[in-house]
Amino acid sequence: MGIEVISILVGGGNNYMHLFYDDDAAFCVDASNPRILLKALGINFKKSIYDEKEIFSMGEDRKKRRELVYLFTTHKHLDHSAGIRCISEESPNTKTISGFSGDICKSGDKFRFKDVEIECFHTPCHTVDSFCFYVGEKYLATGDTLLFLGCGKFFGGTPGQMIKNIEEIKKRVNHDAVLLYGHDYSEQNIRFTEEFYHVPEEIKKKKFLKLAEEIKYNPFFNLKKVSIEGSEEEVMGKLRERKNKFSKE
């Protein structure tokens, strides 16, 4: 796959925007801050993770600004979708793709960026319009469906839907694919996971995990290991409730 990806922390430091790019073109997942995105199109990157202050301070070559081919949005919450209108106005040739605005996608839809295929997975639960985007069989941009050793709150769905989402992802996604999350909640989620079992130091040092690592260590993938009684759906629901309370502590 002849493209690179950077992740930009915006919105106070825990929202991720993901920009896939080569020398002359790019596509983005979740334009949380469209001004940062537009500036990033003209920057030569030296690492894989930046915060928005770093992007603001970097030099930009407007003559070599990359063409923004697609803007994919994982769900309608404004901390992920706020940039759609601005990008549509500033970059009218950009194709905006989501489950709720612009070009409405459905599960199984595929788009091409150069020689890279991007497949849409409908993953309703956090919201009814939640999608993950599978990029070149190497990355899965998950929005708030899956997070580092966690998953999103069930605002628009049921525990059964999250179980189904996880099983579909396990079945359809390369287990060596890297998950690109919608937020950096890694520290909190590590602490929560260690209420049930130990998380190795090499996992704690990472910001993004492979699917195989999530399968092994994410408690929402391991419902039989969390010492909660009930059916599979009941355990998923109780685990999510316990995580909600943990987040407020």
Swiss-Prot record:
UniProt-recorded Gene Ontology molecular function terms: hydroxyacylglutathione hydrolase activity; metal ion binding
Protein name: Probable hydroxyacylglutathione hydrolase ECU02_0580
PANTHER family associated with the record: BETA LACTAMASE DOMAIN (PTHR11935), TENZING NORGAY, ISOFORM C (PTHR11935:SF94)
Residues bound to Zn(2+) 1: H75, H77, H126, D144
Coiled-coil intervals: none
Required co-factors: Zn(2+)
Main location: cytoplasm
Compartments where found: Cytoplasm; Nucleus
Record key words, sorted: Cytoplasm, Hydrolase, Metal-binding, Nucleus, Zinc
Residues bound to substrate: H183, D184, Y185, R240, E241, R242, K243
Function in brief: Thiolesterase that catalyzes the hydrolysis of S-D-lactoyl-glutathione to form glutathione and D-lactic acid.
Pathway: Secondary metabolite metabolism; methylglyoxal degradation; (R)-lactate from methylglyoxal: step 2/2
Cofactor detail note: Binds 2 Zn(2+) ions per subunit.
Family affiliation: Belongs to the metallo-beta-lactamase superfamily. Glyoxalase II family.
SMART domains listed in its UniProt record: Lactamase_B (SM00849)
Taxonomic superkingdom: Eukaryota
GO cellular component: cytoplasm; nucleus
Native organism taxonomy: Eukaryota, Fungi, Fungi incertae sedis, Microsporidia, Unikaryonidae
Reactions catalysed according to its record: an S-(2-hydroxyacyl)glutathione + H2O = a 2-hydroxy carboxylate + glutathione + H(+)
Residues the entry annotates as binding Zn(2+) 2: D79, H80, D144, H183
Keyword flag ATP-binding: no
E.C. number: 3.1.2.6
